[in-house]
Amino acid sequence: MSETSVVLSHPAPHVLQVAINRPEAKNAIDEKTRVALIDAITTGLNDTDVRALLLCGTNGIFCAGGDLASMREMTEQAARTRMQSGHHLIKLLWHANIPIVVAMEKFAIGAGAGLALVADHIVAGENTRMRFPFLQLGLVPDWG
């Protein structure tokens, strides 16, 4: 299990890289990761030295979407809170006053695809796939 669900770095001057880091779960987003993403992106957007934000995944994978294992035993209130924080994350990116770039590898599924589509620019590997499996899972499209 990765110690830090989100890794921050500065690959170039004035660029904040926010990497989803849950390789054991194909970078699926659980509550801890969602909160860490919101915190990291908020910090980056409030930093006047940051002029662009790069969102990516570690270990050659962008994001497998929401962590289904963490949703199985979720109460109605927890599900509502999850949806609200997911919407907050999307709104942060949508209303950002700096360019948001998503670098995708392998796949962006469900909520991961939603994160990618809200970006200003997407850079995707040749074999990258986007998928929206909500209906097959009995879910509604949720993050945007």
Where are each of the predicted segments found?
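Acidic-histidine catalytic/liganding microenvironments
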Residues: 47, 96-97
